[in-house]
């Protein structure tokens, strides 16, 4: 018996045949304006939303409902005094915020925001550029933004910013690997790494449901990628003030702050493109043909990215910060093995479906359910690691990992050798005195004999 593979469907890529230089310029300017406008909206929505979730009003002074609060904050940053540390590496100190902002704004260059539309008589897709490896471009640019954080923390020659930079590099390495593995399953199912073709592949069903475990892994990893609660260890206020941004002021701090919110929009756009059908209308509106054409796609794309933005804001309002060891264990001991296991399953099923005609959504849905059930069983039966004994309950020796440390509340300080010798000498003297006193008392007061 000879097994003949079925033809892999090829999805239509974005058509840039009528693209001109001025159309590309208009799109580039539009993307910058779109991102800045959405950052201003995100600041207002987040602060008002957090206020409602925490039973407080939120910003309500600058303009109606506090709508102009973000503009007031931006103006304040523009006119603040520009300061830096005396020992800072000036060139890298000024360059680092620019690198972070450039990397953040560059991701949207390959994000399809809508189908082909007519602009001044030219048919062009609502996408600045596309390439066969556009998804790899997104991952590469996201990694480039890490240099802005690391260089910013190191160039200040200050302790807390350096701690934040090191934490951020460890965090990105830990979670970007899991995020990349979750996207590989999308590449296998779509048969391409072009973002426009990945969106075209989701015309009938979204990968968020077919590849649900990969979608969950991406959402968790993306939250860690943008340093948001519960993964905001590089900027933990109670531990290292503001992390790598501690020694920055004025608009250099503003660039970092802007890039953080643009990165939130970036991970939301990537989630929309890879898992939520891109600019396609949601079911059941997707069956109406004109709702999947023209400028309607822009509306669906906008609503979908704001769905993910709301999830990021919601998690910040409800979840607590992870402890650092819990955070690293989740990335390396949980997400990485799960992502690898799911990728192997996707590759096997994808290979089978090339030789056997099966319904892909039903097949992957059933495999995904079985995979999740297996994970739940493993999670329930897995014995938790013993919690470390708090330092306040451990025997205090005066040293921790070879370094002298002061005692914590509840611990008894260890006496120095001189104090110990003094205490031992005093105790010996007191013991000898007590013994002599008891002996003298026994001699002076002998026991009376018994009557016979």
Q: Where do the PLM segments sit?
A:
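Selective transmembrane helix interface/packing segments
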Residues: 2-434, 438-452
């Amino acid at each position: 018996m000879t097994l003949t593979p079925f033809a892999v469907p090829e999805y239509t890529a974005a058509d840039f045949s009528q693209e001109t230089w001025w159309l590309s310029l208009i799109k580039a300017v539009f993307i910058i304006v779109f991102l800045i406008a959405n950052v201003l909206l995100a600041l207002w929505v987040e602060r008002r939303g957090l206020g409602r979730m925490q039973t407080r009003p939120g910003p309500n002074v600058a303009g109606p409902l506090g709508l102009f609060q973000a503009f007031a904050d931006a103006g304040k940053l523009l006119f603040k005094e520009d300061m830096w540390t005396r020992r800072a590496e000036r060139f890298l100190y000024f360059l680092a915020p620019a690198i972070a902002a450039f990397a953040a704004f560059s991701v949207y260059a390959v994000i399809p925001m809508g189908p082909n539309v007519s602009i001044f008589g030219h048919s062009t897709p609502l996408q600045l550029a596309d390439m066969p490896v556009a998804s790899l471009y997104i991952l590469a640019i996201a990694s480039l933004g890490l240099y802005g954080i690391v260089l910013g923390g190191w160039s200040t020659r200050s302790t807390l910013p350096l701690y934040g930079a090191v934490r951020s590099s460890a965090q990105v390495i830990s979670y970007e690997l899991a995020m990349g593995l979750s996207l590989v399953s999308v590449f296998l199912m779509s048969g391409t790494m072009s973002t426009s073709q990945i969106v075209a592949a989701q015309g009938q069903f979204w990968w968020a449901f077919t590849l649900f475990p990969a979608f969950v892994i991406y959402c968790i990893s993306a939250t860690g990628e943008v340093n948001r609660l519960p993964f905001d260890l590089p900027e933990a206020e109670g531990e290292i003030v503001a992390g790598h941004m501690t020694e920055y002021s004025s608009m250099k701090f503003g660039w970092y702050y802007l890039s953080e919110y643009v990165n939130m929009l970036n991970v939301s756009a990537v989630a929309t493109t890879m898992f939520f059908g891109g600019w396609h209308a949601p079911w059941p509106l997707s069956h109406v043909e004109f709702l999947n054409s023209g400028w309607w796609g822009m509306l669906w794309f906008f609503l979908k990215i704001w769905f993910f933005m709301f999830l990021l804001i919601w998690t910040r309002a409800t979840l607590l910060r992870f402890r650092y060891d819990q955070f690293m264990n989740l990335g390396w001991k949980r997400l990485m093995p799960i992502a690898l296991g799911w990728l192997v399953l996707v590759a096997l099923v994808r290979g089978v479906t090339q030789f056997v005609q099966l319904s892909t959504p039903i097949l992957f849905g059933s495999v995904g359910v079985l995979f999740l059930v297996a994970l739940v069983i493993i999670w329930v039966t897995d014995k938790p690691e013993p919690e470390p004994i708090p330092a306040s309950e451990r025997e205090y020796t005066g040293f921790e990992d070879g370094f002298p440390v002061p005692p914590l509340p509840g611990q008894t300080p260890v006496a120095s050798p001189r104090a110990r010798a003094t205490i031992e000498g005093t105790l010996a003297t007191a013991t000898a005195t007590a013994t002599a006193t008891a002996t003298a008392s026994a001699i002076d007061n002998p026991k009376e004999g018994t009557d016979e």
